[in-house]
Swiss-Prot record:
PROSITE patterns: LRR (PS51450). Changing F559V: In susceptible haplotype. Induction: Constitutively expressed. It comes from Solanum bulbocastanum (Wild potato). Belongs to a four-gene family located at the same locus. Although the four genes are expressed in the resistant haplotype, only RGA2 confers the resistance to P.infestans. In the susceptible haplotype, RGA1 and RGA3 are likely to be pseudogenes created by deletions and mutations, while RGA2 also contains several modifications. Keywords: ATP-binding, Leucine-rich repeat, Nucleotide-binding, Plant defense, Repeat. LRR repeats lie at residues 524-547, 549-570, 571-594, 595-619, 637-661, 748-773, 823-841, 842-866, 868-890, 891-915, 917-939, 940-965. This is Putative disease resistance protein RGA1. Gene3D superfamilies: 1.20.5.4130, Helical domain of apoptotic protease-activating factors, P-loop containing nucleotide triphosphate hydrolases, Ribonuclease Inhibitor, Winged helix-like DNA-binding domain superfamily/Winged helix DNA-binding domain.
Length: 979
């Protein structure tokens, strides 16, 4: 990838030669010679890149060229940095250190020119041809919605595997394991995803777990990952034995479905250890695994491996067409003919067809397609398939501005879930992004990322809270890794990762160290990226200020750091400073505003009393996650006025703002690139200026996420309407007890999530307009602690809340649940019996979690009669509940039933239990007065799991073999009984 970085250095040289710095210190001729030398060498680089694959001397030549290029980049970078510093000093160009500086630069220039002359002379023996390289991808408009392409030709395979799962689940008496076997790029993972998401599998198995293995078959890591997947949250570090016990408790008696994707482990002992833990599941529990290795299939499989065949020529062609032409109606017949010849070379491998289709998507000249068809790369030695030549071709047909950005992704381990925004910051730090017109570098990086996605280099796109995450196929990752080999020189280490969580790997110019010491910084003066996150640091040494090339510094998660050295502010090239979750950090250096190149300052999770003074001087700043308003000049909202901020920002200590004119100084309405805004006051709610201040903080209409905390005004601002919040998808309002009414949320066309916490006693309806809005996009509604809330709408209609799926109501004693046809999940703390009766209005409900706060002794008989779709029911903290309604029997679809802390509950209804024919899990805990279990349990043939804890009377009656209730539960495979 030398050709890509040479272009970066050439662009820097060209830009530099046009500026005044080169004239002031007298190196114009030297830099001009460097530029000419690189231009001469660059002309033959495309040919060299293609030929190096089977020519070791040529590969070595490229490595030497790459090392020299990085050396030139260091010289240029240091020259610009120090020259700028001299000019900004009081002495200007007459600074006393200018002469030794010129001598040092001149000596280094002579040395690197000698190296480049030797490299240029050596190239002649390779007889390389000059070729024109495409510099940048074609300009086109792209949208923000990212979707995976249609899957072709695997429906038959999906149905066959689903049938195996279902049939085995019905017959098996032990854990079943089915390996899907096939070479890389055939679509084993895609097929497994289709099976995993099939409705038939979802209905028959619970829980469903997906784990990617790759090269690391570590039992502790895998068990931890499985537990985290089931519980949906991160797990603190634990020893293996308690991890094994926890997983067995979670899987005990469950007919689970586990996918182990991309397995390479050939050690039978490792698999045997994991299998022993997994065998606690119910009859029919199933493990589906994907692998390229027959030995892995024979070790793991209890069933005959499913060997995945190549795609048919027709399906391969459809996949290629979808990528190459999109939805274009008219297709050049000559391109179709050439395309079919290219597809033949793909050998029925989907990844090859998809990737080659991606690189040709915006090429419409026949010669461009012929160049791919006739490339000599097809004739190179192949290992397991035709996939690697196809992937190499995809790289060689990338424009220059994409190549190095793609190859850099090799520093992440396989199957890493990468954040697009972070990756773009890394690209910027290494100088891979070229300026383009008036676009910000972040926008250029976004274009590059979209180009690589459209060419199928990235996959598995997810968007969470406004951030985009993605992965790379393991073969695409292998390609990036192989191309990184030219950067293995130890003389140009530019990135160090010293964290403990395996987030990045050591490759090329990136080095991972197991621990950090201050002396480490003195060894690597060319560093662009220094990652010390979660390194348990107490302090950062002042020598950090000597890393003049440093662009990216990550100190996040170092909760012991209380302050940062003043010399940090000497890092004139620093672009990203990541300090999030440095819990003890209370202040930043006063001279932080001198970090003139800073673009990303991440401060969420710190304990700052105020943001550093005069932060508005950081005119390059694009991401400022947190702004803490101070009391003194230079710490106030006006510092945000001229900053073109991107992403999200949380503004706190708004109670310190006394005038709406001060709030207007923030100029939020002009910040079109902010997608998330959080505004917070101290929670005492006694701020007389809050209403005027919030009105003055009107955001831009591009905003998507809005949160307001501790607002003390009596009404929310007029700008909370359709015109300003037309793109908002999520609103959260907490601690606004003085607001007597709510804005017209129902008119917001894109609002998907609405959370209201602790509201005024004057609020009776979420929307009390005579003509209320429809809430056309709302899917999630959470309301806490509204003492007089009676309903959602004062005037209900037929078309309101058409897609609402999830509702949560806590501490709303007057609330009556309306009739809503789409709601599937309800969580409610019952504060009035009326709420219990109104639950029956939600006929589509599949999950119900109710807790009591009214001392109810019984539940309404009609409560369950209309809930025919209910699958999960949890009843907790009904301290005085003595009996359950017989209408429980109408819940024919119920799979899971749980009772917790129902102290007075004496029995479960005999007739009610008999009707629960689909029940697979019953859990009763802390029901101290429960006297016995119903006889009807014997007839629940689907019941596989029974858990009884802290129920002393029943516990004794369930003693194995001799207890009075033992015969009622003896047929249940998995029992958990604790006194």
């Amino acid at each position: 990838m030398a050709e890509a970085f040479i272009q970066v250095v050439l662009d820097n040289l060209t830009s530099f030669l046009k500026g005044e710095l080169v004239l002031l210190f007298g190196f114009q001729d030297e830099f001009q010679r460097l530029s000419s030398m690189f231009s001469t060498i660059q002309a033959v680089l495309e040919d060299a890149q293609e030929k190096q694959l089977n020519d070791k001397p040529l590969e070595n030549w490229l490595q030497k060229l790459n090392a020299a290029t990085y050396e030139v980049d260091d010289i240029l970078d240091e020259y610009k940095t120090k020259a700028t510093r001299f000019l900004q000093s009081e002495y200007g160009r007459y600074h006393p250190k200018v002469i030794p500086f010129r001598h040092k630069v001149g000596k280094r220039m002579d040395q690197v020119m000698k190296k480049l002359n030797a490299i240029a002379e050596e190239r002649k023996k390779f007889h390389l041809q000059e070729k024109i390289i495409e510099r940048q991808a074609a300009t086109r408009e792209t949208g923000s919605v990212l979707t995976e392409p249609q899957v072709y030709g695997r429906d038959k395979e999906k149905d066959e595997i689903v049938k195996i799962l279902i049939n085995t689940a019905s017959d098996a008496q032990k854990l079943s394991v089915l390996p899907i076997l096939g070479m890389g790029g055939l679509g084993k993972t895609t097929l497994s995803q289709m099976v995993f998401n099939d409705q038939r599998v979802t209905e028959r198995f619970y829980p469903k777990i997906w784990i990617c293995i790759s090269d690391d078959f570590n039992e502790k890591r895998l068990i931890k990952a499985i537990v985290e997947s089931i519980e949906g949250k991160s797990l603190s570090d634990m020893d293996l034995a308690p991890l094994q016990k926890k997983l067995q408790e979670l899987l005990n008696g469950k007919r689970y479905f586990l996918v182990l994707d991309d397995v390479w482990n050939e050690d039978q002992h490792k698999w045997a250890n994991l299998r022993a833990v997994l065998k606690v599941g119910a009859s029919g529990a199933f493990v589906l695994t994907t692998t390229r290795l027959e030995k892995v299939g024979s070790i793991m499989g209890t069933l005959q491996p499913y060997e995945l065949s190549n795609l048919s020529p027709e399906d391969c062609w459809f996949l290629f067409m979808q990528r190459a032409f999109g939805h274009q109606e008219e297709i050049n017949p000559n391109l179709m003919a050439i395309g079919k010849e290219i597809v033949k070379k793909c050998g029925g491998v989907p990844l090859a067809a998809k990737t080659l289709g991606g690189i040709l998507r915006f090429k419409r000249e026949e010669r461009e397609w012929e160049h791919v068809r006739d490339s000599p790369i097809w004739n190179l030695p192949q290992d397991e398939s035709s996939i690697l030549p196809a992937l190499r071709l995809s790289y060689h047909h990338l424009p220059l501005d994409l190549r190095q950005c793609f190859v850099y992704c090799a520093v992440f381990p396989k199957d890493t879930k990468m954040a697009k925004e972070n990756l773009i910051a890394f690209w910027m730090a290494h100088g891979f992004l070229l300026s383009k017109g008036n676009l910000e570098l972040e926008d250029v990086g976004n274009e590059v990322w979209n180009e690589l996605y459209l060419r199928s280099f990235f996959q598995e796109i997810e968007v969470e809270s406004g951030k985009t995450y993605f992965k790379m196929h393991d073969l695409i990752h292998d390609l990036a890794t192989s191309l990184f080999s030219a950067n293995t020189s130890s003389s140009n280490i530019r990135e160090i990762n010293a964290n403990y969580d395996g987030y990045m790997m050591s490759i090329g110019f990136a080095e991972v160290v197991s621990s950090y010491s201050p002396s480490l910084l003195q060894k690597f003066v060319s560093l662009r990226v220094l990652n010390l996150r979660n390194s348990n640091l107490n302090q950062l040494p002042s020598s950090i200020g000597d890393l003049v090339h440093l662009r990216y510094l990550d100190l996040s998660g170092n909760f012991r750091i209380r302050n940062l050295p003043k010399r940090l502010c000497k890092l004139q090239n620093l672009q990203t400073l990541d300090l999030h979750y440095c819990d003890s950090l209370s202040c930043l250096p006063k001279q932080t505003s001198k970090l003139g190149s800073l673009r990303n300052l991440l401060l969420d999770g710190c304990s700052l009393t105020s943001t550093p003074p005069r932060i508005g001087l950081l005119t390059c700043l694009k991401s400022l996650s947190c702004f803490v308003i101070g009391k003194r000049k230079g710490h106030q909202l006006g510092e945000l006025k001229n900053l073109n901020l991107y992403g999200s920002i949380s503004i706190t200590k708004l109670d310190r703002v006394k005038k709406d004119t001060d709030a207007k100084e923030a100029n939020l309405s002009a910040k079109a690139n902010l997608h998330s805004l959080c505004l917070s006051w101290d929670l005492d709610g006694k701020h007389r200026y809050d209403s005027e201040v919030l009105e003055a903080l009107k955001p831009h209409s591009n905003l998507k996420y809005l949160e307001i905390n501790g607002f003390g005004g009596i009404r929310l601002p007029d700008w909370m309407n359709q015109s300003v919040l037309k793109n908002v998808v999520s609103i959260r309002i907490r601690g606004c007890e003085n607001c007597s009414c709510l804005p017209p949320f129902g008119e917001l066309p894109c609002l998907e999530s609405l959370e209201l916490h602790t509201g005024s006693a004057d609020v009776e309806y979420v929307e009390d307009n005579v003509h209320p809005g429809r809430f056309p996009s709302l899917r999630k509604l959470v309301i806490w602690d509204f003492s007089n809330l009676k309903g959602l709408l004062k005037m209900e209609g037929e078309k309101q809340f058409p897609v609402l799926e999830e509702m949560t109501f806590y501490w709303c004693p007057m609330f009556v649940i309306p009739t809503l046809s789409s709601v599937k999940t309800l969580k409610v703390i019952v504060t009035d019996a009326t709420v219990l009766r109104s639950i029956s209005n939600l006929r589509a409900l599949t999950s119900l979690d109710i807790s009591d706060n009214v001392e109810a002794t019984s539940l309404p008989e009609e409560m369950f009669k209309s809930l025919a779709n209910l699958k999960y029911l949890k009843i907790s903290f009904f301290r005085n509940l003595k009996e359950l309604p017989t209408s429980l029997a109408s819940l024919n679809a119920l799979k899971s039933l749980k009772f917790e802390f129902c102290d007075a509950l004496e029995s479960l209804p005999e007739e009610g239990v008999k009707g629960l024919t689909s029940l697979t899990e019953l859990s009763v805990s802390n029901c101290m007065m429960l006297k016995c279990l119903p006889e009807g349990l014997q007839h629940l043939t689907a019941l596989t799991t029974l858990t009884i804890t802290q129920c002393p009377i029943v516990f004794k009656r369930c003693e194995r073999g001799i207890g009075e209730d033992w015969h009622k539960i003896a047929h249940i495979p998995y029992l958990t009984l604790y006194e």
